[in-house]
Every structure is written in C-alpha cells, then in structure tokens.
Amino acid sequence: MESIEEFEKRLGYRFQNKNLLIEALTHKSYKKPYNNERLEFLGDAVLDLVIGEFLFLKFPKADEGELSKMRASLVNEKGFAKLAERVSLGRHIFISNAEENNKGREKPSLLSNAFEATMGAIYLETGLSVVREVVHRLLDEVYPKIDLGSLFRDYKTALQELTQAKFGETPEYVILGSSGPDHKKEFEVAVCVLGSEYARACGSSKKEAQQEAARIALEIFHRKEKEAKESALKGKSE
C-alpha cells in the first residue's frame, strides 16, 4: 500500500497535522471514534465556493443561469469522484473489511465523500487559498478542454441513474400541456418518481422541458440529502 506521503504528493499539499488527514480518509464503517462525516460537511461548502469561483473566472461571458448549470454538473458525487480518482484517493481511505470486499475503494459515493472531507481538512489547516489552488489545478487536469457545451449534463440520464440506485425505479415524464403559436410553442412537463411529482418545468421543446424538470428534480434530491446529513450530524452532537 502506498504511503500517505505519496498521496500528499499527488494532491499537491502536505499536511502539518497528519491526524486531520487520517480523519478525512476514514469512512464510518472503519469503526473508529472518529470518521470523515463532519469534514465532508465542511468540504462540501468550500468546494461549492471554489468551483463556482473557477467557473466565474473561466467563463467571463457566461450568464448566471449558465454558471449555475455548469456548477451543478461539477458539484456532485460523480464530479467529486472524478477529482478523487485523479489523485488515487481510493488507495488511501480507511474502510471496513465488508466495504473492502464490496469494492468500497471504487464506489463513487465513498470517493466523493472522502474528497470533500480532504478539502475540508485542508481548509481547516490553511484556509481557502490553498483549497483554491488544489481544486483549480485538479479541474484543469481533469477537464483540460473545458467549455460551456461539455459541462452541460444530460440531466435525464443523471436522474434516472439516481432513482434506479435509490428506489429501483425510473422517472416518468408527463406532458402537462403546451401554449403559444406553432412557430413558438412552449411545453410544460412534470417529472414523477414513485408516482409523486417532484418537479415541473417549461421549454421550447418537450426534450428541453424534460431536461429542465430533471435538473430541478436533481437539485431537490441533492438538497434533501444535504439536509439529511446536517440533521444526522446535529443529532449526533446533541
């Protein structure tokens, strides 16, 4: 197994407090008095800011809506897992034997959480400037030809992957109606999961409306996940 020093070298940052790094790499399954959940919570907020800043500087002509969509395509489990893979983070996480046997080192969720926690740990030790340097460098390495088009996600596919993983079900899209003249029609679509409406949106085509509804639904799912994490952490501290 590679040393922590090798990981730090790839990361481009050497921790003064190694215990902080070890905590960031420790999954809750490892059964220690500590795990990386609190650092993950902090890192999530830090990454939201520095990735937003990266896009703001990279695309001076992009409007707020475009920047928000691009950030949503990077600030998520899949995006963070890609950055984690870039520094071979999976080799260094501390997990239980059960997780090891279940290929836990390759799971996007574990990689994403540990990456968030590691960024939270760097922030605690040195502040925002070093996190910014590390993350901006990794983004340039992972997305060398980043542009507006390449960052817009297929939200329908992303939502389907999420709902199949969580519920074993695929989303259903319902056309609620259309308005406007034939040359400038607008369609309204609702996306339903397990029979319940999660979001609705409008677009100049059915496909565009479905993509926007899927994007909103993804935001709702991610917000609920974040709120659940915050609630769980609050419960543990009380």
Swiss-Prot record:
Classification via PANTHER family: RIBONUCLEASE 3, RIBONUCLEASE III
Residue intervals of the DRBM domain: 154-223
Gene: rnc
PROSITE patterns: DS_RBD, RNASE_3_1, RNASE_3_2
Location of the protein in the cell: Cytoplasm
Keywords: Cytoplasm, Endonuclease, Hydrolase, Magnesium, Metal-binding, mRNA processing, Nuclease, RNA-binding, rRNA processing, rRNA-binding, tRNA processing
Source taxon at top rank: Bacteria
Predominant cellular place of this UniProt entry's protein: cytoplasm
Gene Ontology biological process terms in this record: mRNA processing; regulation of gene expression; rRNA processing; tRNA processing
Role noted for this protein: Digests double-stranded RNA. Involved in the processing of primary rRNA transcript to yield the immediate precursors to the large and small rRNAs (23S and 16S). Processes some mRNAs, and tRNAs when they are encoded in the rRNA operon. Processes pre-crRNA and tracrRNA of type II CRISPR loci if present in the organism.
Molecular function GO labels: double-stranded RNA binding; metal ion binding; ribonuclease III activity; rRNA binding
EC number of the protein: 3.1.26.3
InterPro entries per the UniProt record, alphabetical: dsRBD_dom, RNase_III, RNase_III_dom, RNase_III_sf
Active site, renumbered: D44, E116
Species, as recorded: Wolinella succinogenes (strain ATCC 29543 / DSM 1740 / CCUG 13145 / JCM 31913 / LMG 7466 / NCTC 11488 / FDC 602W)
The RNase III domain, residue ranges: 4-127
Recorded catalytic activity of this chain's protein: Endonucleolytic cleavage to 5'-phosphomonoester
Enzyme class, first EC level, given as a word: hydrolase
GO CC, alphabetical: cytoplasm
Protein name per the record: Ribonuclease 3
Similarity comment text for this entry: Belongs to the ribonuclease III family.
CDD domains from the UniProt entry: DSRM_RNAse_III_family, RIBOc
Keyword RNA-binding: yes
Cofactor dependence: Mg(2+)
Residues bound to Mg(2+): E40, N113, E116
Subunit text: Homodimer.
